[in-house]
């Protein structure tokens, strides 16, 4: 079958492996695509080749393409569409290609959740679900869970003789709350839903604790821990062997050798026992006895070597002591008793989880909603059926999908979970050797385990499949990287060849996994990768862990700011592939990658201080924003005014504006009771004269508050929020503060959040406040409104997770000295997909607790998985760089850390010892030991090659390794220091001598006058109507502009307003009719009535406006000479908008500024008739004429001419400028009285 694959065309851009991935067929195929290897292009090309295959073309809707995100799915569709359009250019007559383009929008190219949704919509009748279901909001989901769980526990507490439940409560709750028990139930529910059969997985948890008739050797936990014990004993042996080598040196402590050999024999005995059984090792551990070291005269030997030997021996003894205390201080039978004792309690816990799942599903069903895990499980339910022996087999629907899909292609396969794998399995062929499943991914970039992704699925197939595809699936390695320079790739390879292995890291970083150069770059300067390790001296360290973290962030931020500024200022060059040339680096070429975002605000602040534009999509800080915080307190007070802290916050805020003294005065009126009660009491009495202002402020707020509370009971939450914004004027107020637009955007987001909340199944202010609390509890704070867009020339800061799939010319990876987050390992209970449930053994009667075997096994397993995940995260970070990679980390004591890292230099294999890699607590613990074995670290270490093999020491990679003194970074710059001194002098109101060389410049700045002061009182943009009014005013000033700054006059309440349209609204209605009336139809009452009715239907007019139209006046116009001219004309334009620049002195009579100033003028011309000899301009007027002027129209005419002369002159000027055609006639038509006025110049 391989021979039948199309051969790669001559001169093809594809590599051999890429071409194989494009055309290989006839079996399941796994493509291991390294970073930057062009996997998306390969995937698209494979799809195109299948669609346009001459012998066996496949319709695009017979392919299922599963992507990780909706954006990736859309990009895939776009790429396929573009490729098909290119084919169509070469084959314009191809009906097949045209058909594929029409099918593309309906093709199954989507995320797995979108596919599930499609299946459920098609077969909803097979489920107990409302076909009109909606996807639940995450916070709404959490609140529903809380509600269901509260009900279940309340019922359980009310059952008499519920012994096991109360034992469960005693073991896993505190005396204050049952929060821990609730967390356990929810965690078990969530974990179970990551498995195809949640109930089966839960049952296995309970079965694991039923140890009746079993020995400790039968337990999976003991088997796993024994492997770990072997690992630790091997580490202890390595320490003793290293100590022995040192003792044998010419100046080493030779008398120690005999003792060390005895130690090796002891460790050998323990290791042999570990290979036999747990019981054998337990017995051996009881007989451990270390020989006492012989006294030696230290002056006879090298003191440093003696210290190293003794230190290494103590490390080995500590390893064994730790094992003795954790695992072998208790008899094997006592561990079994723990399991048996916990079995009924765990059984009860699992029963509660099952009840919770059932009730939660029922509540969602009643509310017509589903969550994302439901989509997967409902889809699986449709696609599978259970056999008699409990196995899941494909259903009739699944078989239909199997027949429909010619191939299923899965992108980012390494991030698939067990449920998704089952769904894919049911819509593809059974046999891997004859399968139709094409999977693309890179297990080294699997970094979503926290979302329950399972990299083991990829690894299992990678180990099982062969490159030839004989007897099973085929694997193809795409190792060529078309993104990065040699220096980036070689640097990454050098580190990962040393740290990533199967035992520690889950993946062998072998020759197949290494990145291979595929991109071509011109020679560049300063392209070596860098490791900058900042030494944080004792003087710099702020007390407390949090303070130290802030200090580290500041140090690294300052170093990065200096480097970025230096690179930009020096014109550092990067390659522009589009233009095939080098160009100076821009800010947008830099990215700063962080493991998580807590440091981002400090880094942003430091970069801004250096004048570097920076952008970070911060998912925090929204609810901390002052304006949002104040508004949230207002809503808390509306919900419950008896809350003192929120009420005091609102009273002190700009909304009420009390000072500290006024707040104290209010409290002095009632030392007992809540602030609200004191305020109510204060308002009932007559205020003292000096308290009148305080009384007025509180009375104003109190009346508003009562109105809001009443409104909240009857109206929607979103309406309440906007009402509060409007009545307090707070929305407008924050708009006038610095960053006003952003603050207003934050308030609008709060309003939008309320509308989203109202779209859920919850209602009311109280539940909304709880809704927000849940968001904050989950750590899902939103980012504040964006001030800088992502496309601007800015340095970007983002998490490594967010950067996946992106690339940047220059990459800083910062925070490499931060400790890995191991909080999950510290929880009171642990869960694992394979090992189930583990917690401490708690005996409430004896008041004792201790670690169990299951907890130790799960903790160790999770630690190793965490280490592997962090390695993959580091790999993703390093492979984002195209041209320059700079790694930065901070340590408290560089000398001490170096001593630890230098241990790696004694190791002669590529892969560092397991204990070094598994014992890492931060990324630097992997990177530094690796680089300290390379020749480029010599400038720092000056230790020579030593025993490091040539292939490692001289590996073809370029690095700059440097330790940076933190003191030099924190030293104030001279300018800043001078500035600080000046500020301090000014605060103390001292005279400041201007000794600076720039004193003349300072004087000039202080005495400077704005050269365009006249322009500040006149608008730069005017409408024609405003210019007309301006000419009519006495002094020509822009009163309308100034009026906007005046306090508004309160409008009457609506119930007191007179009904009917205003003059302006009537005029607008008439103009609308004149714009839309059909000039080709006869102008009669019936025709006009019909047309006006049509305008109402199209919402061009309101019903009220239509009622006010005087149809006879419209007919009168068309009966006039001017109207007949309009009807007879060949070219008539109506409602013609225009914009033009006008000299300021023409627009403003009082203009005294620069003669070169211009303003932008906008207007709309009602009607124009274009004829060969010129344009007739018509402006319709609805002014009242009849009865207003005693002298009739003859008196009105000169007044009207004067009033509108400027307006029509501007219209004429605009038309003549734009159309290059003269205006021969300017007419005003007044509907009141059917009058025409010709405006002459």
Curated annotation (Swiss-Prot):
Give one GO molecular function term.
Answer: 3'-5' DNA helicase activity
Instruction: Tell me which UniProt keywords the record has, alphabetically.
Output: ATP-binding, DNA damage, DNA repair, DNA-binding, Exonuclease, Helicase, Hydrolase, Isomerase, Nuclease, Nucleotide-binding
Q: Which GO terms describe its cellular component?
A: cytosol; DNA helicase complex
- Its Enzyme Commission number(s) read 3.1.-.-, 5.6.2.4
Domain UvrD-like helicase C-terminal: where?
Answer: 505-805
Q: Which cofactor does it need?
A: Mg(2+)
InterPro entries (UniProt xref): AddA, DNA_helicase_UvrD-like_C, DNA_helicase_UvrD/REP, P-loop_NTPase, PDDEXK-like_dom_sf, PDDEXK_AddAB-type, Restrct_endonuc-II-like, UvrD-like_ATP-bd
Output the PROSITE patterns linked to this UniProt entry: UVRD_HELICASE_ATP_BIND, UVRD_HELICASE_CTER
- Per UniProt, residues of the UvrD-like helicase ATP-binding domain are 12-485
Q: One GO biological process from the UniProt record?
A: double-strand break repair via homologous recombination
User: So where does ATP get bound?
Assistant: 33-40
Q: Which reaction does it catalyse?
A: Couples ATP hydrolysis with the unwinding of duplex DNA by translocating in the 3'-5' direction; ATP + H2O = ADP + phosphate + H(+)
Quaternary form?
Answer: Heterodimer of AddA and AddB/RexB.
Family designation: Belongs to the helicase family. AddA subfamily.
Instruction: Explain the purpose of this protein.
Output: The heterodimer acts as both an ATP-dependent DNA helicase and an ATP-dependent, dual-direction single-stranded exonuclease. Recognizes the chi site generating a DNA molecule suitable for the initiation of homologous recombination. The AddA nuclease domain is required for chi fragment generation; this subunit has the helicase and 3' -> 5' nuclease activities.
- Under what name is this protein listed? ATP-dependent helicase/nuclease subunit A
Q: What is the lineage of its organism?
A: Bacteria, Bacillati, Bacillota, Bacilli, Bacillales
């Amino acid at each position: 079958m391989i021979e039948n694959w199309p051969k790669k065309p001559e001169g093809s851009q594809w590599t051999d492996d890429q071409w194989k991935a494009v055309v290989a067929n006839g079996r399941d195929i796994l493509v291991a695509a390294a970073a930057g290897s062009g996997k998306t292009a390969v995937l698209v090309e494979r799809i195109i080749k299948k669609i346009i295959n001459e012998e066996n073309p496949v319709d695009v809707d017979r392919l299922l393409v599963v992507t990780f995100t909706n954006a990736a799915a859309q990009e895939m569709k776009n790429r396929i569409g573009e490729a098909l359009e290119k084919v169509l250019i070469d084959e314009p007559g191809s009906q097949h290609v045209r058909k594929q383009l029409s099918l593309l929008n309906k093709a199954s190219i989507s995320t797995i959740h979108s596919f599930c949704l499609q299946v459920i919509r098609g077969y909803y009748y097979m489920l107990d679900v409302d076909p009109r279901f909606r996807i639940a909001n995450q916070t709404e989901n959490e609140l529903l869970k809380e509600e269901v769980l509260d009900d279940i526990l309340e019922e359980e507490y009310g059952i008499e003789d519920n012994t096991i439940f109360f034992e469960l409560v005693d073991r896993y709750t505190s005396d204050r709350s049952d929060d821990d028990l609730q967390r356990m139930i929810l965690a078990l529910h969530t974990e179970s839903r990551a498995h195809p059969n949640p109930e089966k997985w839960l049952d296995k948890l309970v079965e694991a604790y039923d140890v009746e008739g079993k020995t400790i050797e039968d337990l999976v936990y003991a088997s796993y821990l024994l492997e770990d014990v072997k690992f630790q004993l091997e580490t202890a042996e390595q320490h003793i062997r290293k100590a022995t080598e040192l003792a044998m040196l010419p100046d080493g402590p030779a008398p120690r050798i005999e003792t060390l050999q005895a130690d090796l024999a002891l460790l050998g005995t323990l290791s042999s026992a570990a290979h036999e059984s747990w019981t054998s090792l337990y017995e051996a551990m009881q007989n451990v006895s270390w020989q006492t070291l012989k006294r030696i005269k230290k002056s006879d030997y090298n003191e440093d070597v003696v210290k190293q030997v003794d230190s290494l021996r103590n490390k080995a003894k500590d390893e064994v002591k730790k094992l003795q205390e954790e695992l072998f201080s208790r008899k094997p039978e006592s561990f079994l008793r723990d399991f048996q004792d916990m079995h009924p309690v765990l059984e009860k816990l699992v029963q509660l989880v099952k009840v919770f799942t059932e009730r939660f599903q029922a509540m969602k069903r009643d509310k017509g909603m589903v969550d994302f895990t439901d989509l997967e499980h409902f889809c699986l339910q449709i696609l599978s059926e259970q056999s008699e022996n409990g196995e899941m087999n494909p259903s009739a629907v699944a078989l239909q999908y199997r027949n429909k899909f010619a191939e299923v292609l899965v992108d980012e396969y390494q991030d698939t979970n067990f449920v998704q794998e089952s769904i894919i399995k049911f819509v593809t062929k059974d046999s891997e050797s004859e399968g139709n499943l094409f999977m693309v991914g890179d297990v080294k970039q699997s970094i979503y385990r926290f979302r329950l992704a399972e990299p083991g699925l990829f690894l299992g197939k990678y180990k099982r499949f062969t490159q030839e595809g004989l007897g099973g699936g085929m694997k193809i390695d795409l190792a060529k990287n078309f993104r990065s320079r040699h220096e980036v790739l070689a640097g990454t390879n050098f580190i990962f060849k040393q740290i990533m292995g199967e035992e520690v890291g889950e993946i062998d970083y072998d020759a197949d996994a290494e990145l291979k150069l595929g991109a071509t770059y011109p020679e560049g300067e300063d392209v070596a990768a860098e490791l900058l390790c900042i030494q944080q001296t004792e003087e710099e360290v702020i007390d407390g862990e949090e303070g130290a973290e802030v200090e580290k962030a500041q140090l690294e931020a300052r170093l990065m700011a200096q480097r970025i500024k230096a690179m930009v200022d020096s014109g550092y060059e990067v390659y522009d592939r589009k233009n095939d040339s080098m160009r100076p680096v821009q800010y947008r070429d830099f990215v700063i990658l962080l493991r998580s975002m807590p440091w981002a605000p400090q880094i942003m602040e430091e970069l801004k201080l250096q004048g570097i534009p920076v952008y970070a999509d911060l998912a925090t800080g929204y609810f901390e924003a002052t304006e949002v915080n104040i508004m949230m307190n207002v809503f808390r007070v509306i919900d419950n005014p008896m809350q003192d802290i929120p009420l005091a916050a609102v009273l002190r805020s700009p909304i009420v504006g009390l000072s500290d003294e006024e707040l104290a005065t209010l409290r002095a009126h009632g030392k007992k009771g809540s602030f609200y009660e004191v305020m109510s009491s204060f308002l009932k009495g007559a205020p003292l004269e000096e308290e009148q202002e305080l009384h007025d402020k509180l009375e104003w707020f109190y009346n508003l508050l009562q109105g809001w509370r009443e409104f909240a009971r009857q109206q929607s939450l979103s309406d309440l929020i906007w009402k509060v914004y409007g009545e307090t004027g707070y929305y407008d107020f924050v708009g006038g503060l610095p960053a006003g637009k952003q603050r207003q955007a934050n308030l609008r987001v709060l309003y939008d959040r309320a509308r989203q909340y109202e779209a859920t199944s919850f209602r009311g202010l109280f539940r909304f406040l709880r809704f927000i609390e849940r968001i904050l509890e989950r750590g899902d704070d939103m980012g504040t409104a964006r001030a800088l867009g992502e496309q601007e020339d800015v340095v970007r800061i983002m998490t490594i997770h967010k950067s996946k799939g992106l690339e940047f010319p220059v990459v800083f990876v910062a925070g490499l000295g931060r400790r890995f987050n191991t909080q999950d390992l510290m929880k009171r209970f642990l869960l694992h997909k394979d090992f189930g449930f583990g917690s401490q053994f708690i005996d409430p009667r004896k008041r004792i607790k201790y670690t169990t075997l299951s907890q130790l096994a799960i903790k160790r397993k999770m630690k190793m998985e965490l280490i592997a995940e962090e390695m993959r995260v580091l790999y993703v970070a390093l492979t984002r760089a195209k041209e320059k990679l700079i790694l930065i980390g901070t340590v408290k004591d560089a000398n001490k850390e170096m001593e630890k890292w230098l241990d790696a230099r004694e190791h002669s294999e590529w892969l560092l010892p397991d204990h070094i890699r598994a014992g890492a607590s931060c990324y630097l613990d992997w990177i530094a030991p690796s680089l300290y074995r390379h020749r480029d670290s010599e400038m720092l270490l000056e230790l020579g090659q030593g025993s490091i093999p040539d292939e490692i020491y001289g590996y073809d990679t370029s690095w700059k390794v440097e330790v940076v003194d933190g003191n030099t970074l924190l030293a104030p710059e001279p300018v800043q220091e001078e500035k600080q001194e000046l500020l301090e002098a000014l605060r103390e109101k001292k005279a400041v001598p201007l000794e600076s060389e720039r004193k003349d410049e300072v004087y000039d700045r202080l005495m400077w006058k704005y050269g365009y002061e006249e322009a500040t009182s006149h608008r730069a943009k005017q409408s024609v109507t405003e210019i007309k009014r301006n000419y009519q005013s006495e002094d020509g000033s822009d009163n309308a502009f100034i009026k906007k700054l005046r306090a508004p006059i309160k409008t009457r309440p609506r119930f007191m307003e007179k009904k009917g349209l205003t003059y302006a609204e009537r005029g607008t209605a008439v103009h609308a009719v004149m714009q839309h009336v059909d000039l080709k139809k006869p102008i009669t009452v019936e025709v006009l009535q019909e047309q006006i009715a049509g305008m109402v239907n199209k919402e061009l007019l309101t019903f009220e406006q239509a009622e006010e139209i005087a149809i006879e006046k419209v007919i009168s116009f068309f009966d006039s000479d001017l109207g007949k001219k309009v009807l007879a004309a060949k070219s008539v334009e109506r409602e013609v908008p225009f914009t033009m620049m006008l000299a300021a002195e023409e627009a403003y009579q009082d203009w005294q500024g620069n003669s070169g100033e211009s303003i932008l003028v906008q207007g709309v011309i009602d009607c124009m008739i274009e004829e060969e000899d010129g344009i007739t301009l018509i402006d319709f007027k609805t002014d009242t004429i009849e009865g207003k002027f005693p002298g009739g129209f003859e008196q009105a005419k000169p007044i009207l001419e004067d009033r509108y002369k400027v307006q029509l002159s501007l219209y004429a000027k605009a038309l003549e400028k734009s159309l290059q055609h003269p205006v021969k006639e300017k007419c005003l038509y007044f509907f009141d009285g059917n009058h025409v006025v010709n405006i002459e110049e």
